[in-house]
Curated annotation (Swiss-Prot):
Cellular component GO terms held in the UniProt record: mitochondrial matrix; mitochondrion
Protein name stated in the entry: 5-aminolevulinate synthase, mitochondrial
Keyword Transferase listed: yes
GO BP terms, alphabetized: heme biosynthetic process; positive regulation of organelle assembly; protoporphyrinogen IX biosynthetic process
Other facts: Present with 22600 molecules/cell in log phase SD medium.
Residues recorded with modification N6-(pyridoxal phosphate)lysine: 337
Family: Belongs to the class-II pyridoxal-phosphate-dependent aminotransferase family.
Active site: 337
Assembly mode: Homodimer. Interacts with MCX1.
């Protein structure tokens, strides 16, 4: 896999110049929480932010010294909120009520005001699928609404056991553990690893999700942040430590705001070479990649997994003993995106799962998800596993939109995944574009601003699903083109004249091929191993506790 476009941007003086010209404020990529400033514009933004914080602190201190009643809490809160309004990062939530029987439609405050949703993470529309809803209805009728407490106090139940067995089977691991969300799963697992391995050194991709950043912070161990997808820098950092020092490489498969993809196999090679564990977040990949929807790690050995079905392949696609998915030590995922439900999980070895179950506070002290939620997620996983057509149609719809945008000069940050990030480059304009789409064209696409992405890289994030037909796509494409004309937003040629940014309009930039090959996209459900249809999946002992 080629070197990251983000690494190239970070080292490019032309890109820094572009940020200074096309954005009122350039800043380090703020999603990671550790980022260092890039270029003069970023330094200026950092200085401005520092002075603003200093002024707010001084005002708070003055209030504290003059008011007998004590600290001016409301003054501090007002100051922080005002800063967000001034830098255009203050967020307004739209009232969007997605309709179960009219996907991808939703209504706003008034039921008559309908819009087409183009930015949902319900990637496969399984939250509305009849089999999923039926499983939830039956379970709630039988077991009620809530779980009654934590698993430690209230015990767990058959839906929980079934779900964890399905997740372990999906990722071909010995066990899985369900959490209330993947944010909690990432935080709980990463923090526990650091708390129990005091000499652990964590190597984290700079674009990792906030949940991973928080987990690494809570781990309270030494950490290194490497440039996004820059494996040369990662290796340099790894080789600076003896092999005897415990290490962990934390990364994602698909990075949600730009659609970039990690080279999982090469990261596993580095982990083997330098004695590191691997922690892979597949949140934006499960359901969408691999013959059975286990994610990008499964996709790396696509044919071996397709042929073996739910069984573990005897060899990988290159004839080796282990698949890439087998080589990854810990895989976290979500039930709340492609699987249409809510919750998160980790899949790993039997011993690791028992360890997390026994020691992770984020698991021990959190009320268990409702039985109906567990049952719905299980139904979704089972359905999507044997329906590769969901994945192929989603990919085809994504390609259709990307191709049309390319022909119109609409700037899409290039990537090999299912994400369609339309570069705007200005927070205020991104919100205006989103507002025009929903109010004039009845299309809902949320603007993505700081701190989710860096200032100067604001965007519209579009996510086609199997339900977004070409007819709906044509309406979207025409609407976005209209918005670009109305707001005079920069197109590819405009970015190119300024030196390019994030792969848009960059001279000599070579875009990566889509993860799905043409032969993979031509597969049908009948091309899958029959053992994926209604398999008997046994409950796991580790879910309840291992008896000695």
């Amino acid at each position: 896999m080629q070197r990251s476009i983000f690494a190239r941007f970070g080292n490019s003086s032309a890109a820094v110049s572009t940020l200074n010209r096309l954005s009122t404020t350039a800043a380090p990529h703020a999603k990671n929480g550790y980022a260092t400033a890039t270029g003069a514009g970023a330094a200026a933004a950092t200085a401005t932010a520092s002075s603003t914080h200093a002024a707010a602190a001084a005002a708070a201190a003055a209030n504290h010294s003059t008011q007998e009643s004590g600290f001016d809490y409301e003054g501090l809160i007002d100051s922080e909120l005002q800063k967000k309004r001034l830098d255009k990062s203050y967020r307004y939530f739209n009232n969007i009520n997605r309709l179960a029987k009219e996907f991808p439609l939703a209504h706003r405050q008034r039921e008559a005001d309908k819009v087409t949703v183009w930015c949902s993470n319900d990637y496969l529309a399984l939250s509305k699928h009849p089999e999923v809803l039926d499983a939830m209805h039956k379970t709630i009728d039988k077991y009620g609404c809530g779980a009654g407490g934590t698993r430690n106090i209230a015990g767990h139940n058959i839906p929980t056991l079934n779900l964890e067995a399905e997740l372990a089977t999906l990722h071909k691991k010995e066990g899985a553990l369900v959490f209330s969300s993947c944010y909690v799963a990432n935080d709980a697992v990463l923090s526990l690893l650091g708390q129990k391995m005091k000499d652990l050194v964590i190597f984290s991709d700079e674009l990792n999700h906030a949940s991973m950043i928080v987990g690494i912070k809570h781990a309270n161990v030494k950490k290194h942040i490497f440039k996004h997808n820059d494996l040369n820098e990662l290796e340099q950092l790894l080789q600076s430590y003896p092999k005897s020092v415990p290490k962990l490489i934390a990364f994602e498969s698909v990075y949600s705001m730009a659609g970039s993809v990690a080279d999982i196999e090469k990261i596993c090679d580095l982990a083997d070479k330098y004695g590191a564990l691997t922690f892979l977040d597949e949140v934006h990949a499960v359901g969408l990649y691999g013959p059975h929807g286990a994610g990008v790690a499964e996709h790396c050995d696509f044919e071996s997994h397709r042929a073996s079905g739910i069984a573990t392949p005897k060899t990988n696609d290159k004839g080796g003993a282990k698949t890439v998915m087998d080589r990854v030590d810990m895989i976290t995922g979500t039930l709340g995106k492609s699987f249409g439900s809510v919750g998160g999980y980790v899949a790993a070895s039997r011993k690791l799962i028992d360890w997390f179950r026994s020691f992770a506070p984020g698991f021990i002290f959190t009320t268990t998800l409702p039985p109906s939620v567990m049952a719905g997620a299980t139904a979704a996983i089972r359905y999507q596993r044997c329906h590769i057509d969901l994945r192929t149609s989603q990919q085809k719809h994504t390609m259709y939109v990307k191709k049309a945008f390319h022909e119109l000069g609409i700037p899409v940050i290039p990537n090999p995944s299912h994400i369609v990030p339309v570069l705007i480059g200005n927070a205020d304009l991104a919100k205006q574009a989103s507002d025009i789409l929903i109010n004039k064209h009845q299309i809902y696409v949320q603007a993505i601003n700081f701190p989710t992405v860096a200032r100067g890289t604001e965007r519209l994030r579009i996510t086609p699903t199997p339900g977004h037909t070409n007819d709906l796509s044509d309406i979207l494409i025409n609407a976005v083109d209209d918005v670009f004309n109305e707001l005079q937003l920069p197109r590819v040629r405009d970015w190119e004249s300024q030196g390019g940014l994030l792969g848009v309009g960059e001279s000599g930039f070579v875009e990566e091929s889509n993860l799905w090959t043409s032969s993979q996209l031509s597969l049908t459900n009948d091309d899958l191993n029959p053992n994926v249809r209604d398999p008997i999946v046994k409950q796991l002992e580790v879910s309840s506790g291992i008896k000695q």
